[in-house]
Amino acid sequence: MNIGYACINMQLSYPQKYGGKERGVKPITTGRSMIKRTFETKGVDYASEIALANAMDLDKIIDWNILNGYKFFRITSGLAPWKSEYEWKDLKDLKQIQMYLHSAGVKVDTHGVRITCHPGPFNVLTSPHEHVVENCVGDLTMHGETFDMMSLTRTPYNKINIHIGGAYGDKEKSMERFCKNFERLPDSVKTRLTVENDDKASMYSVKDLYHGVYERIGIPI
């Protein structure tokens, strides 16, 4: 049986509490971030430093996962803080970030570890509002670029999994918008995207997604 976990390695992130023999060592985490005021003050260079630290620790977490037999891992969506405000090419540490991401990707490929991600609920391709869709396309593109830097397969095996968003009073029209806006995504996202059903009756069931999304554009559920 293969097992895994999502995003936060409690033992490495909080060694004083959960670390056992790792007690006293520096936390290893991909959750470093900053508030907007800090970003506005310190700018993209500081974001680059945080992204590099997160990428370095992602590589270490992958090592730990392999050593401890974890074959599934959902990575954080926040490797680069405030990523909506800049491009990868703007980061002064990009080459090093790419190096650590590629290193992590080679390891998961060698050891058969499945990497996925689950972008946040603000990714709403069903939205009738253009600025919401634009932001969604940008955020999903960032995830696709991250997976490409890790050299992960462009297949649902390395899925970018999302809920499709609001129903806006008309599920059918909303799913039509989703399918239309799907075409705006780059191939790095299209080839990996999967959709997940909701647990509320007013939202999208597996049946809704099968007929309204999968049958139209073939996205796995």
List the model feature ranges, each with a label.
Residues 158-174:
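Glycine-rich phosphate-binding "P-loop"
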Residues 142, 169-184, 195-204:
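Active-site glycine-rich loop that binds ribose-phosphate moieties when present
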Residues 118:
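Conserved, mostly hydrophobic/aromatic
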